[in-house]
C-alpha cells in the first residue's frame, strides 16, 4: 500500500546539563559575548552618545528701531558725522551730529505670523563740500526661538563699508544669520543675552565706542551677523543730495544646534546598539547550534514537541 504525507509538526531539540557543567559555562560565555561586544563596538566607533543635534526653525525677529551711524568723510583725515537713537550718544557728538531721515518696514511674506524681511532706508543730509567715503552702521533686533527651548536675545547687525572714492548711495542686501559657539539647551527658558547690545542709559563715551560694542558682543556664545551683505557703492552725488543707505535684510530659516535630552540620547544609542546586536545574535545562535549538535560540550539531547515547550514556558 502506498504511503502519503498526511501531517507534520516541528520538533524542538533541547539539551540538558548541570549548572556547573562545561555546557552551562559555554552558554554563559556565549551569552556574554553576544550582548557585551556590540556595546563596546558601538561605543568605540564614536558618536554613540548624541552630544549635539540640529533642527530647523524660522526665528521670530523684530527690528527694535535702534540705530547707530558713523559716516566717514573725506578728504580731511578723521572727519566724520554721527547719529543714533540714543540721546546721550548724540549729545557726545557735538558738531559731528547730523540727524538723518530714517524709514523702515518689515514684511511677513508667507503670512506665518513671523517677519521675513526688513527694508531700511536712511538719508543723511550733506553739505556740498562733504563727501562720504565709508559707513559704520549698527541695527539692533529682538531674536526669539521657541521650538525646543525658549531662547530670547537682543542682537545686532553690523555693517561696515569703505571705499576710495566718494559715494552717493550704499545698497546692501543680506541675511541676518545666527552664529552659535555652543549648542542651546533642549528645554527651558534662556534669556542670558536678552540685554541691550548698546547701553543707551550710560553717560560714558566708552559705552558707545564701536570697538567696545563689537568686542563685548563677540564675547557672547550666540550672536547674529549680517551675512553676505553684497554692498553696492554708487558714486556721483548732486551738490545738495543726501547720502542714502538702502538695506534689505532677510530673516531666513536657521539650522539650530542644541544639546539633546536624556531620552533622545538613549534612543539614538539604542538604535546603534541593536543594529550591531542583531549580527552577534545571528552568529552566536549558529555557534551554539554547532556546539550542542556535535557534542563539543557534553549534554543530553531531548526531542520536545513545540507544544510541550510552550506549556513548560507557561507553567
Swiss-Prot record:
**GO CC term, one of those recorded:** MKS complex
What does the record say about its membrane topology?
Multi-pass membrane protein
Keyword Transmembrane carried by entry: yes
Q: Main localisation, per the record? A: membrane
What is the annotated localization of this protein?
Cell projection, Cilium membrane
Q: Which keywords fit this entry according to its UniProt record? A: Cell membrane, Cell projection, Cilium, Cilium biogenesis/degradation, Glycoprotein, Membrane, Transmembrane, Transmembrane helix
Keyword Protein biosynthesis listed: no
Q: Which Pfam families match?
A: TM231 (PF10149)
One GO-annotated biological process of the protein: camera-type eye development
Q: Which domain of life is it from?
A: Eukaryota
Q: Which chain regions cross the lipid bilayer? A: 23-43, 262-282
* Glycan attachment positions: 194, 199, 221
Question: Which InterPro entries does the protein's record reference?
Answer: TMEM231 (IPR019306)
**Subunit arrangement?**
Part of the tectonic-like complex (also named B9 complex). Interacts with TMEM107.
Name the protein family: Belongs to the TMEM231 family.
Q: What does this protein do?
A: Transmembrane component of the tectonic-like complex, a complex localized at the transition zone of primary cilia and acting as a barrier that prevents diffusion of transmembrane proteins between the cilia and plasma membranes. Required for ciliogenesis and sonic hedgehog/SHH signaling.
**Official protein name in the record:** Transmembrane protein 231
Q: Which organism is it from?
A: Rattus norvegicus (Rat)
Gene that this polypeptide is encoded by: Tmem231
